[in-house]
Amino acid sequence: MDKVLVTGVAGGQGNLVARRLARAYEIVGADRTPWKERPRELRFYQLDLRKRRFEDVVRRERPHAIAHLAFIRHFEEAPAVRHQVNLAGTKRVLECCVTYGVKQLVVFSSAYVYGALPENPYYMDEGYPLNGSRTYPDVRDLVEVDTLASAYLWQYPEIAVTIIRPVNVLGYSVHSAIGRYLQLEYVPTAMGFNPMMQFIHEQDVAEAIALAIERRARGVFNLTGPGAVPLKVAIAETGGTAVPLPEVLARPAVRTMFRLGLYPFPPGAIDFVKYPCTLDGSRFAAATGFKPRFGLEEIFASLRS
């Protein structure tokens, strides 16, 4: 049985990916924090990917594939720490793949790397420029991770590098920024804007990562769910009340509250509730046969629970 190492396995999405892959592979998990929901039969290493011990684990375990989900995506951590963990951790994973003959690497990127800009076309494909850091410097690390992994994709053709850029992920287990935003009772929005947004269920994301490994998909892929809805529909369907605010007041207020630790999102996030960032997921569907199993109603219901 082939072996898969799942980094970030203690997180909600990593845990789901490990459990899905365990149906067909021997699973080894790694994370900085304890894996509280670890099935007893699966091995786990609590470690920092940036440290030498991670390389020791890869050398000893010799995984066939690595599913890399060990990223800090919230903004509660210091920016320098987030950047170090995300970028230096990914570089260490990539180097270990080259050194120890890992055959496949799946990197869990984000749709946020494209950025939310007024000139964005609807349903961007994978060739669209990565503008995320132009107006949202707080996610610059995600853009750099995606770019770094893309370079390995071409430099090391013997490794099937798969970069997956999912749209907004919601579910019972994941703790995404968009999930926290939609769980607010009164949800601030930018007055005069109501962009189309896409969502995907966490279980479908786990299935997509498993399919990427099973089909040895190689390349950069958008990952989309069952469709798109206006932001205010998503707010209503998840039980919130939209509160439109003039941007001239909202942006400085968000900047101040974020700096003081009173609001969880930096001001750059405002653009994602103004402008569209919708993706075309047809390439991944063609490469793997992926079809989302969860509809929008089930996705939104998972947030209301």
Region locations from a protein language model:
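NAD(P)H-binding glycine-rich loop region in Rossmannoid oxidoreductase-like domains
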Residues: 47-88, 96-99, 116
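NAD(P)-dependent short-chain dehydrogenase/reductase
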Residues: 152-202
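Amphipathic terminal alpha-helices
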Residues: 283-286, 291-305
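Mid/C-terminal beta-alpha module of Rossmann-like enzyme folds, strongest
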Residues: 206-267, 281, 297, 301
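Active-site Tyr-X1-5-Lys
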Residues: 134-162
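Conserved Rossmann-fold NAD(P)-dependent oxidoreductase catalytic core, especially the SDR/UDP-sugar
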Residues: 92-138
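N-terminal Rossmann NAD(P)H-binding glycine-rich loop of SDR-like oxidoreductase domains
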Residues: 2-23
